[in-house]
């Protein structure tokens, strides 16, 4: 395990982060800690300020402090103290100084770093009075608003239909129920009865589990698996298909099917740490041409229903291979329905930690092995299907009783009315490649859902939605690497879920060169010029933290974070006086944290 961090910047105790954790790691990893010793970003004169502060205020061992890789010396005005008579004057003066930096250094960025959200708003107001374009990062984060969380919840259920939090947000945000607690209870109750909210969208009167039991009872299902040249459903080839037929949870005797397929594409030599067994199998078995082998499988399937483990992958790569090699046969027309034992296990056993085929065989003591050969994997999947069939039959009575409750029927109808068409249309688009000139599928889906919510009065207008759209388009998603919604969700949904407003600051979508940000939001960002606003005792450290040693030390680190956002120039601003509770002027003192570094500033 590797831990990366900088203890000088540990400022999130209010969110539960504890500096004691670093002490534990330091003791645990004694003798095996690597410190980066060269600072490649900061000019030497700025690093001297930060190192002096770290050593004398933060009490960091001088041997652990970095060295500059340059000998840059400070020019006049690059480290400077700024004074204003009062806090009200300081808002105006700092805004005017930011204007000066903006005009004098036309390719550079400037940040005004404040200690509170209210200061950020007042500084922003002063900048607006000067008609100076700027980007404010403070208060409620754009990505933390209920509106944006609702938009992302839609993307999340498309990426993972079993996402409990995303469904809960949708149920509340779409006003199916009134409260967050009620939304969570509804989704949890569905889960406890083998249901997802999507069941109410996919079925008018039934469920995925009920459909599975009915189909297994009335028809034969084809349990199949594929081995392929890779994981891309759009471009990779199938090299083996294996299948068996089942009815009422039992394998139909003599129904085994297997075919190997010739390909000129490269086959991976290893699957993780193991040698890819399909390479040896292909050497010892007849390999059919693509079109012949695929048609053999379709003839075998006939009118039966397909089932696979993680069937979305197998079904869609089969569909793309058919389109490529069999005169454009569309599997969605030929076999429009398929089941997924992975989804069934999620529904029937919602509390498992793993759902891979190998894990299920071990957990439920089922016969078979996950060998990465289609015929062996089909045997294992068939045993999982048999388990699912019996487990599902035992659940049906309770599930139907739950769905018959008036409250559940009311919620289901509301969800259908508001969300069914949006959800089903989006699912149909998941595996549709888009032309290069088109809007990115993920962005198009996000904006389509946003427009629908606006039109139905379910959200207010999101002022920053354009930033999100542009950021995803220009900085996150590469159209040349993934051009379908399913690929873009698979590659980027986790990253999108962790986005913060501050991420926009270092992106190409923010054209502004002046930023207003709180210290906590500034962490991780960097700017050419930094103005630390109103650096007085009472703010650094906070008045209420002065008797608490731990909070006092954290405030010292906050001030370090504020200063260290600078790449070139650093300005410390303060107001000289304030009006006390008795309406009397009182002098302000420059923060005590400046004492050991004051000599560097003019």
Could you describe each region identified by the protein language model?
Residues 1-52, 538:
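Conserved helicase motor core of SF1/SF2 NTP-dependent helicases
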Residues 9-13, 138-159, 323, 336-354:
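Short alpha-helix plus adjacent loop in nuclease-associated cores
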Residues 28, 105-212, 362-366, 378-380, ...:
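ATPase/helicase motor core of nucleic-acid motors
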Residues 30-32, 39-132, 283, 454:
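Helicase P-loop NTPase motor core
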Residues 160-222, 230, 245-247, 411-517:
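Accessory C-terminal helicase-associated subdomains
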Residues 219-222, 229-327, 331-332, 351-366, ...:
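Conserved non-catalytic scaffold segment of RNase H-like nuclease domains
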Residues 240, 320, 515-544, 570-571:
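A short beta-strand element within the Helicase C-terminal
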Residues 387-388, 510, 536-602:
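C-terminal accessory regions
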């Amino acid at each position: 395990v590797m831990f990366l961090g900088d203890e000088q910047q540990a400022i999130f105790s209010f969110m539960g982060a504890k500096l004691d954790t670093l002490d534990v790691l330091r003791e645990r990893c004694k003798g095996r800690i690597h410190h980066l010793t060269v600072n490649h970003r900061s000019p030497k004169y700025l690093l001297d300020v930060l190192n002096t502060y770290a050593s004398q205020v933060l009490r960091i061992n001088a041997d652990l402090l970095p060295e500059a890789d340059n000998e840059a010396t400070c020019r006049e005005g690059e480290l400077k103290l700024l004074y204003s008579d009062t806090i009200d004057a300081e808002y105006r003066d700092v805004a005017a100084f930011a204007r000066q930096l903006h005009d004098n250094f036309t390719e550079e960025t400037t940040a005004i770093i404040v200690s509170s959200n209210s200061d950020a708003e007042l500084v922003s107001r002063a900048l607006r009075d000067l008609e100076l374009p700027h980007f404010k990062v403070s208060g409620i984060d754009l990505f933390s608003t209920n509106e944006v969380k609702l938009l992302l919840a839609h993307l999340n259920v498309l990426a993972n239909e079993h996402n409990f939090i995303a469904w809960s947000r949708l149920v509340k945000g779409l006003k199916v129920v009134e409260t967050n607690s009620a939304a969570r209870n509804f989704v949890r109750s569905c889960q406890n009865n083998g249901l997802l909210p999507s069941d109410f969208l996919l079925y008018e009167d039934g469920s995925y589990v009920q459909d599975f039991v009915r189909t297994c009872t009335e028809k034969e299902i084809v349990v199949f698996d594929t081995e392929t040249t890779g994981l891309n459903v759009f471009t990779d080839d199938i090299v083996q298909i294996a299948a068996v037929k089942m009815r009422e949870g039992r394998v139909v005797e003599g129904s085994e099917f297997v075919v190997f397929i010739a390909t000129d594409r490269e086959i991976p030599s290893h699957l993780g740490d193991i040698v890819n067994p399909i390479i040896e199998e292909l050497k010892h078995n007849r390999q059919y041409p693509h079109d012949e082998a695929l048609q053999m499988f379709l003839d075998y399937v006939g009118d039966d229903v397909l089932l696979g483990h993680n069937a979305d992958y197998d079904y869609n790569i089969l569909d793309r291979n058919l389109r490529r090699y069999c005169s454009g046969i569309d599997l969605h027309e030929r076999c429009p329905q398929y089941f997924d034992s992975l989804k069934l296990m999620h529904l029937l056993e919602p509390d498992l930690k793993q759902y891979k085929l190998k894990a299920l065989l071990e957990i439920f003591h089922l016969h078979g092995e996950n060998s990465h050969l289609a015929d062996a994997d089909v045997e294992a999947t068939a045993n999982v299907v048999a388990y699912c069939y019996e487990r599902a039959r035992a659940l049906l009575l309770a599930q139907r009783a739950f769905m018959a409750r008036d409250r559940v029927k009311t919620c289901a109808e509301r969800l259908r009315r508001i969300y069914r068409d949006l959800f089903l249309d989006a699912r149909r688009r998941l595996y549709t490649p888009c032309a290069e000139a088109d809007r990115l599928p993920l962005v198009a889906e996000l904006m389509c859902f946003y427009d629908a919510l606006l039109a139905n009065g379910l959200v207010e207008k999101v002022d920053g939605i354009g930033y999100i759209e542009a950021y995803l388009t220009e900085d996150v998603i590469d159209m040349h690497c993934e051009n379908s919604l399913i690929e873009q969700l698979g590659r980027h949904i986790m990253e999108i879920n962790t986005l913060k407003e501050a991420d926009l600051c270092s992106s190409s979508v923010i054209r502004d060169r002046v930023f207003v940000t709180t210290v906590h939001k500034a962490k991780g960002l960097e700017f050419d010029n930094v103005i630390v606003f109103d650096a007085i005792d009472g703010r650094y450290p906070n008045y209420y933290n002065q008797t608490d040693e731990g909070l006092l030390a954290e405030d010292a680190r906050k001030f370090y974070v504020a200063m260290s956002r600078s790449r070139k120039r650093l300005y410390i601003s303060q107001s000289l006086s304030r009006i006390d509770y008795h309406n009397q002027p009182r002098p302000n003192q420059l923060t005590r944290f400046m004492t050991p570094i004051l000599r560097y500033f003019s």
